[in-house]
Amino acid sequence: MIVRPATPADYAVLADLWFDSWMSIGISNDTDLSREGVRARFYNDAATKWDLFTAEDGDRLHGLLALVPTEARIDQIFVDPEGKGTGIGRLLMDYAKRCLPDGIVLVTHTDNLRARAFYTHHGFTLERTEEDPVHRRQKCHYAWRPGS
């Protein structure tokens, strides 16, 4: 398994992976995007906002990591639902820490308990919570600092 920069040829697969992984969490609601909406957002953000990476094993993509380096932020980190718990997330998180060695921030939904446990396990600390007006639920702001 390697982490490499994603290319436009990967975008359709990664957009579907993002959607499928989000749906597998089980916290979606009526305000969430359709598969087509996620694809449109993915293509736009990949072109305008993200440094995008993928976890690849042979010819299969298993995860995505979307960084916003100017904000030292992980915007998205998702693993194929079949690959959860296999170390792919750890591989992507370690890569993010190498890309942003001075510290990282990220946001997740409060009820995304598996992600919150993952971030805590990888040295992130909860800084604050606030209401997310789009999804109408609480979101958590996390930060990682070197040495933590």
Regions found by a protein language model. Give the residues of each.
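Conserved GNAT acetyl-CoA-binding A-motif
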Residues: 99-111
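Extreme N-terminal starter segment of soluble prokaryotic enzymes
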Residues: 1-3
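Active-site acidic-Proline motif in GNAT/NAT acetyltransferases
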Residues: 80-82, 86, 110-111
